[in-house]
Amino acid sequence: IQSDYIYESFWGNEGRFTGLFLLLIYGLSFLIIFRLGHMKTEILEMFLAASLFVCIFGITDYLDLNLLHFKDRIVEEQYTIFTSTFGNINTYTAFVSLTLGLSSFLFATDGGGVKCFWHYICMLVAMAALITGQSDNAYLALMAMFGLLPLYLFRNWKGVKRYSVIVATFFTVVQIVDWISQH
């Protein structure tokens, strides 16, 4: 209403292409999902499985393998800001951050067994993908994860142990990515 470009502000056809209409759709989608949706663990597992493909393609892009040939027509100056199937590095980082947060939480709260191992693998790959994504937004996601997880996990000794495993895994992944980058 206060913009000089009311039409563009509503439809979002300029700048970052996010207008009031898109924000209303986001809000409406949230309300519908929140009111009518029932979270099932199968949905979370499917999300993690699909996320693994995105993360793996992001890691291979970091290694300049370009398996999907998405970067074949990108201008050389913009080559590093596009990755995986998402394109923009910040959108990719936001998605991988969701994957990392979910897999870390599920790993930390699992009782053990195959699901715990599956969530650990998802967490491991998501950590590597977040680091190789090379986005500044990754720092914010990591600070949120490592800052908020203890609030839930430190209620018992098992949570403290799992948090320690998560921290140790993260630093191990950092060392491995650094070693790969140097060779």
Question: What is each model feature region?
Answer:
Residues 1-9, 62-66:
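Transmembrane alpha-helix boundary signature
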Residues 15-182:
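Alpha-helical transmembrane segments of multi-pass inner-membrane proteins
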Residues 7-17:
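Short acidic, glycine/Ser/Thr-rich loop/turn "cap" segments at secondary-structure junctions
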